[in-house]
């Protein structure tokens, strides 16, 4: 929302985004660990989100701890560059979170999958999703100019590459899949590899970025699957360009649109026809998944979108009132819309639409 507001010059939207981010930064910190809580409810801030019942160990997750620090830094950077307002308190908070996460790495340089909500100590490891911590550390180094952690970041990057990316087996991303092999955790690594290339100029990171994107592209269909079930089959929705979520969840969702900038970065530094085609696919797919008018997808208002797009009959759990299946989920998913906005308002931004 903040990126979109800054691109559009929408002051009301920007104020709403800054208010939300500022509230989280001011109130969501766990004083016992120095990390940000992951959810909020009637009982206050906590780490028991909707995914909690599927977890084996309670506590903070490296996935969300690193992701929250990364996006806090990204928001500060964007609002300073395009909005003219610095947020040193956000940068300092994210830096303190990164420091706590760095202290919890294991001997391989891997960040925790789960951290204690009492002490911040690492309790469980073995996950690609914790690469969000590495992405946050790299972005903090870029924004502050503090390069003192580069050697440790290089060690962590090498571990994630060898243990997950090089094997083509990235698991432990989303918290609701019991560490199934998925397409989400690698999105954090993709960001980290791009940032480390920016920081060092080392060709190694560009090669690793290419390999990580090649893995992510395996979750994209190279053809448009024939769809008969509405609403997707009725409106001409294209399955080509989006990414399947994981090996245990057969639908396409929009999270891969968040790395449009990274795909474009690779193409700018190592031009390749295949990468250019996947960039074009992802960009086109990202522009067709929301209601362009009320109830275009048989529910909701203009601008609404879901997270679930069923390219097959594997997850058509949504039903119409007459009991017939629907090929999407009739739900407003803010994170899904935000994923598209992050990609479409980034480096590829075209004010002409």
Predicted region positions:
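Glycan-recognition and catalytic cores of secretory/periplasmic carbohydrate-active enzymes
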Residues: 1-353
